[in-house]
UniProtKB/Swiss-Prot annotation:
Belongs to the thiolase-like superfamily. Chalcone/stilbene synthases family. This is Chalcone synthase 5. It comes from Trifolium subterraneum. Pathway: Secondary metabolite biosynthesis; flavonoid biosynthesis. Its EC number is 2.3.1.74. The lineage of its organism: Eukaryota, Viridiplantae, Streptophyta, Embryophyta, Tracheophyta.
Amino acid sequence: MVSVAEIRQAQRAEGPATILAIGTANPANKVEQATYPDFYFKITNSEHKVELKEKFQRMCDKSMIKSRYMYLTEEILKENPSVCEYMAPSLDARQDMVVVEVPRLGKEAAVKAIKEWGQPKSKITHLIFCTTSGVDMPGADYQLTKLLGLRPYVKRYMMYQQGCFAGGTVLRLAKDLAENNKGARVLVVCSEVTAVTFRGPSDTHLDSLVGQALFGDGAAALIVGSDPVPEIEKPIFEMVWTAQTIAPDSEGAIDGHLREAGLTFHLLKDVPGIVSKNIDKALVEAFQPLNISDYNSIFWIAHPGGPAILDQVEQKLALKPEKMKATRDVLSEYGNMSSACVLFILDEMRKKSAQNGLKTTGEGLDWGVLFGFGPGLTIETVVLHSVAI
């Protein structure tokens, strides 16, 4: 008779969860930040709000973003004027867009990840899908399963409405699934489309305007599994430790509410200050067991909520400017893509590390950290170990 303990032992993987492939995708429509204020105020019939436009221009100039990608083209916005008005009932129009576009963009990223992985998609055992862009039943996980032609008995997990910290959440969940299920191969997809948050400007709600200056569309996909098959699967990063915490005294710092007018976005407190005040504690908890206290000796992937967050974290920890280079490069090229951002940065880092002839996927260093920040204020921490190139 086999004991429960023996069954349990047989079910578990031997080694740590590893990221085996990464794919990314963006809509075709590229938006230049320098000219975006003109477009935005014109398409929303707000050109008479001269002072507000100047304010928005300054927000865009300070954003450290050069370009973003958006599903919402001029044509789509002209066909859906309710989306352009500030707080006009428009949820139906927005939902009609995102229930199609979110899985479609997710599929684009997933196809690239599966190709890099090099294994048949029939070997995918689990699917995690994450989006803050709309809700539906059955969800985007189901739609993606159909679009990719995955097996009907893939174990799916759908995460809706998590916000900007969720790139860390999906890694934490994928790690637990991979390590507790021998042979598991987890497809992780984050897909974000700003059609839910786009709206015209308001004199009285400048936090909404901040979102209009920062958010972009993108999807990222990973394959995660333990015990890579030698000669076939090539690990990129190992996931060693994860944590999630709610920052003290931060309630209401970042809020999003799904309303008739779409997803509303609110910044109510000093978000960069809250993040920088709590980052030290998160790092000590993560790296004390490894005897690491010099945070310039690790590689960095931080959700780029905006440039002020990165500036304050750098200042607080006395980080060298190059530590946040991959993070800032992704912010500059794509804007804030919510949950997908940190996965884009992982991709950027491993590619640049190889191009620059460095010895590991983590900028030549062994250990690194990935941070997600978002509503709550919630902080996700993932300790990563790089792989030799």
